[in-house]
């Protein structure tokens, strides 16, 4: 059974891209360079929907530039879940994941990023790298908040995270982590 791929169509001639990383529209309340999405379903929802199914795969064939955003999102979700514990309350989790989203992070294409063979970004072009950094930061912030909504939605009091989500902290998508 093959892995699930992104359903978002990306045209490299008309869509915004930095190297081969697509800057897809987001439904977000955080400030950043992402355009607002035309629909209720965006790449962040797709990352959250496909995370559990795709986390079992060690190989992933990239079929479109949107798949690269999906890969980054799945790796970031795994990183966020690794910072949560079964005893972490919702308010603590908001603080923890906000810090994780805003922490210094390596950009695709820079030394230290785990999947540099997948991403080809113009490291010498500082404007493009700044655009990519602010987009990824906006993406990480929104993804962390939506992840919290899903992880803490199954309990009535929003006091403790869902053990079914936390069970995926041991899984490594493509044997990589951010």
From Swiss-Prot:
GO biological process, one term: actin nucleation
Record-linked Gene3D superfamilies: Actin-related protein 2/3 complex subunit 3
A Pfam family per the record: P21-Arc
GO MF annotation, one: actin binding
UniProt keyword list: Actin-binding, Cytoplasm, Cytoskeleton, Isopeptide bond, Ubl conjugation
Localization of this protein: Cytoplasm, Cytoskeleton
One cellular component term from this protein's GO annotations in UniProt: actin cytoskeleton
Source superkingdom: Eukaryota
InterPro entries cross-referenced by the UniProt entry: ARPC3 (IPR007204), ARPC3_sf (IPR036753)
Cross-link (Glycyl lysine isopeptide (Lys-Gly) (interchain with G-Cter in ubiquitin)): 29
Known partners and oligomeric status: Component of the Arp2/3 complex composed of ARP2, ARP3, ARC40/p41-ARC, ARC35/p34-ARC, ARC18/p21-ARC, ARC19/p20-ARC and ARC16/p16-ARC.
Described purpose of this protein according to its UniProt entry: Functions as a component of the Arp2/3 complex which is involved in regulation of actin polymerization and together with an activating nucleation-promoting factor (NPF) mediates the formation of branched actin networks.
PANTHER family, per the entry: ARP2/3 COMPLEX 21 KD SUBUNIT
Sequence similarity: Belongs to the ARPC3 family.
Miscellaneous notes: Present with 1920 molecules/cell in log phase SD medium.
Record's protein name: Actin-related protein 2/3 complex subunit 3
């Amino acid at each position: 059974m093959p892995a699930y791929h992104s359903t978002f169509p990306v045209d490299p001639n008309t869509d915004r891209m930095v190297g081969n990383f697509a800057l897809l529209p987001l439904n977000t309340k955080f400030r950043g360079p992402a355009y607002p999405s035309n629909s209720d379903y965006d790449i962040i929802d797709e990352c959250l929907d496909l995370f559990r199914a795709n986390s079992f795969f060690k190989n992933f064939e990239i079929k479109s530039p949107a798949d690269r955003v999906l890969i980054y999102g799945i790796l970031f979700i795994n990183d966020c879940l690794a910072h949560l514990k079964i005893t972490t309350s919702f308010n603590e989790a908001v603080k923890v994941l906000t810090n994780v989203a805003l922490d210094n992070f390596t950009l695709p294409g820079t030394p230290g990023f785990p999947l540099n063979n997948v991403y080809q970004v113009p490291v010498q072009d500082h404007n493009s790298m700044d655009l990519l950094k602010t987009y990824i930061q906006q993406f990480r912030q929104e993804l962390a908040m939506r992840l919290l909504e899903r992880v803490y939605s199954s309990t009535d009091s929003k006091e403790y995270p869902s053990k079914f989500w936390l069970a995926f902290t041991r899984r490594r998508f493509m044997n990589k982590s951010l």
